[in-house]
């Protein structure tokens, strides 16, 4: 379930919030990118069932009992940890300016922000970048390949799935020797991520599987091209 949160839950929220990027003319193209739908749909149902009966109730309970300032602070801490991966992929993509911004964010948030509890970087005008190795592979020219829904990991593509391995080495959990502390950190990350996305569900309409697929493919293209998506018109 730990991996489930950091991937499926976070991407679920991004998909909902980026739903406006999904243009009707692109739906057919998205469907053509899903030749493995017969496999993907059952896996999607499995993931969604876990979310409905396990992760979502935990997130709702967490949100109900956690003061907003504490919830925000915890979320900021995990974002600060994630900025290390953003920085690494900035460099791999040759984005020098973005790398400088993310370096500054990590330094200021870790020190003045008390290990990231306070997001002083954003208040200083240092906007957070969102990069991963799947995007890096896209920038390097590797095609996304077919759409793929991974058990517990959620929506992906062949390219993005292969990018998860390098990304995993940038996560802090494998470097925490104390097993109970490591497990607690993972669980809190899972629940906090899902709780921050509860309000995003209202954006879903129609067939949930198709909505998530189409939004995911559009979102990833948008991110790989840094918003410079070609217009079909």
Region annotations inferred by a language model:
Residues 13-24:
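Bacterial N-terminal signal peptides
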Residues 53-69, 134:
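Membrane interface segments of multi-pass transport proteins and intramembrane proteases
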Residues 1-9:
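N-terminal secretory signal peptides that target proteins for export/translocation
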Residues 31-33, 48-59, 82:
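Short alpha-helical hairpin
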Residues 32-46:
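Short N-terminal segments immediately surrounding and downstream of signal-peptide cleavage
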Residues 80-155:
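Mid-length scaffold segments of soluble, non-membrane domains
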Residues 24-31:
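Sec/Tat signal peptide C-region and signal peptidase I cleavage site
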Residues 31, 135, 140-233:
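A structured, mid-to-C-terminal "fold-capping" secondary-structure block
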């Amino acid at each position: 379930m730990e991996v489930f949160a950091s991937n499926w839950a976070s991407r679920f929220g991004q998909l909902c919030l980026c739903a406006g990027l999904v243009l009707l003319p692109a739906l057919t193209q998205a469907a053509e990118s899903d030749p493995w739908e017969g496999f993907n749909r059952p896996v999607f149902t499995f993931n969604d069932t876990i979310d409905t009966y396990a992760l979502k109730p935990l997130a709702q309970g967490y949100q109900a009992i956690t003061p907003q300032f504490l919830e925000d602070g915890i979320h900021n801490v995990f974002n600060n940890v994630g900025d290390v991966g953003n920085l690494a992929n900035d460099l791999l993509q040759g984005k020098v300016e973005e790398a400088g911004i993310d370096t500054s964010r990590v330094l200021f948030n870790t020190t003045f922000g008390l290990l990231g509890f306070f997001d002083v970087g954003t208040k200083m005008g240092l906007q957070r970048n969102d990069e991963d190795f799947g995007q890096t592979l896209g920038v390097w020219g590797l095609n996304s390949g077919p759409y793929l829904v991974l058990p517990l990991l959620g929506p992906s593509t062949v390219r993005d799935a292969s990018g998860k391995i390098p990304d995993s080495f940038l996560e802090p959990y494998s470097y925490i020797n104390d097993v109970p502390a490591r497990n607690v950190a993972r669980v809190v990350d899972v629940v906090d991520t899902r709780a921050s996305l509860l309000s995003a569900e209202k954006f879903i309409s129609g067939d949930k599987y198709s909505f998530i697929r189409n939004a995911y493919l559009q979102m990833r293209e948008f991110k790989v091209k840094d918003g410079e998506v070609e217009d079909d018109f």
